Amino acid sequence: MKQWKLFCLCALVSAPIYAQFTYPSCNPLQQSEFQATELFNKTGANSAQATNSGLNEPVQFDVQGVYNTNGDSVLYTNIYFVERKGKVKYYDGLAKRVDSIGFIPNWGYQSSNNSNDNGLMGIVLDPNFNTNKWIYFWYTPTIPGAAATGASSNANRRLRLSRITLTAQNRLDMASEKILIDVLGSKTDQYHCGGPMTFDRNGDLWVTIGNNSNDLNGSGSQYAGQTSTSPTATDSNNSGEWGSANTASIRGGVIRIHPDNAATTVRTDRSGTYGPGYTVPAGNFGDYWAGQFDQSNPTLAAQYRDPSKVLPEVYIKGTRSNYSVAVHPTKGWLAWGDVQYNATNDEYNLVTHPAFTGMPYFMANNTPTPAGSIVLPTGHSAATPINASLMNSGVRNLPPATPALIWYGTTTTQTTMNNNVAISGPIYSYNRNLKSSVKFPPHLNNSWVLMTVYGSPSSGQMYIAMLDSINPVLQGTPQQQGTAGVVRFNVRNPLQAKYGPEGALYILNYGSTGAYGSGNNPGISRINYTGSCQLAAVPIAKNTRAANLNVSMFVDGLVVHEGGSHEFSMIDLNGHQIFTVKGIGETRYSFPKLSAQFGFKKGVYLARVQSNQGVFTRKVSLL
């Protein structure tokens, strides 16, 4: 495992625990510079909290910013969140009140069995929500005519991605529901249905979907019994090869689509219906791996381009129970947490391109999972995984398994993170042009929030890991819980965290009791930074040139004519610093090469050169 710097966010303490977070010209962070406020909880009894909350299993949320008339500053934030049993609720940040705004019928409510992952599992607001009022939901719809137990209707279980519009009265208009994806679920299993979603800066929607399988049978194998039995004679419940390792299945991975109301394409297969209402961005799993295999195995490359063999929506395969997702705001790196083999081995993943992450064959650092009585095909390894199951309708030869970035459980000696559910929080990108007095400071630029749920302590934990500024790896060495450098906030089994439009951190606490219950005091909190280290905005409306700093522009780059040292940065129009590199002497910078290295896309940016001779800035368009 790569070395990594880890800081715990648990109960509030008074020690100077932020000391290891530093930034040039600013003091090290202090605990007193952060203010944690519980916006509302289950009872809402505190007058400072929202009234009428009455929470019951809140699982996911999103934050809406209400802006000033100039549109450049957040006045306050509203929160939309869902409860697993189907209620959609709204926290009014101005009135400080929680109200129910709708109910989505779902199998988690219809079924009398509460111990499952079915229900209303995900919510995300459209990037243009303030004008179009669109909300996306991931849920397991009700089964028409099914009894409360649902035992006679297992074959009709489904997984669904929908878009619903709010009315002018801020209520769900169920008649407006637009179903984007509707597929069959497991016939007998109710677990690992996924649901967390996020949008990236390109307007692409990322959706996590677990393997929708309990994937353990009597032998303890993740995939036993499914390579020798006809899929028509048995259910796929006990097979990870049916979902996680099946490239033609939506289950066991992460999908990426681009919602487009004008898109009319509809595709159906044996599992369900895809579309209309979205397009598929280039560069997903099939596109990427076809390109990788073009030279070495053209026949296999052709299979990866076949939409009947590789689902076009798929970006990641090989997950088990991934109930979190985050995308780096500027670099586009994809992060998620996954509950791995036997629910005792968890991992955090961070990738820069489509990948197969191992399940059901491998976990953690590509440690094999138990195969039970199954004899794996000749040639099967982490470098050349093979899905030979009769349950497999996708490609047989999978890409090399990508190991996790962080893992813990029976396969590691990492004891500071030993809980039962790995949840990826957001990755922070400091925006110096954002007008906000509470946004997190530049010390935490490129930091990644990690969370654990249940286990010991039963309330879960939160950490901040610092990422390398260029590559998706972690910095530093482990910090043990309780030592200097540990950051602490109060959490009660945190299921989700995300940064709001004002740069504050929001945390959803499921509650301190176990899963599938009303929970002991669930709620949502906000953490504001109240310190003094905020950087001045970067001017992006005009070009500047220092009298003694000689920089020459050319078609696709620039040359710094400088005898000493300098820094070259690329900044987007929101003030996010895409990257910074240091140079000495005369240096030529090629925009296409830098784009390939740092992963920024076409658009308008500010190129910035700084040395002891001054500062040079120029708006550039990358086509």
How does the language model describe each region?
Residues S152-T198:
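Asp-box/WD-like beta-propeller blade repeats and closely related beta-sheet repeat scaffolds
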Residues G332, G503, M570-I578, Y605:
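Short, glycine-anchored, charge-dense loop/turn motifs used at functional sites
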Residues G531-G557, L623:
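Residue-level detector of functionally pivotal "anchor" positions at catalytic/ligand-binding pockets or at interdomain
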Residues Y76-F103:
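Beta-propeller domains
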Residues K542, L594-L623:
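C-terminal tail/sorting-segment detector
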Residues L94-L125:
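Blade-loop segments of beta-propeller domains
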Residues N41-G86, N420-S424:
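Beta-strand-rich domains and repeat architectures in extracellular enzymes and scaffolds
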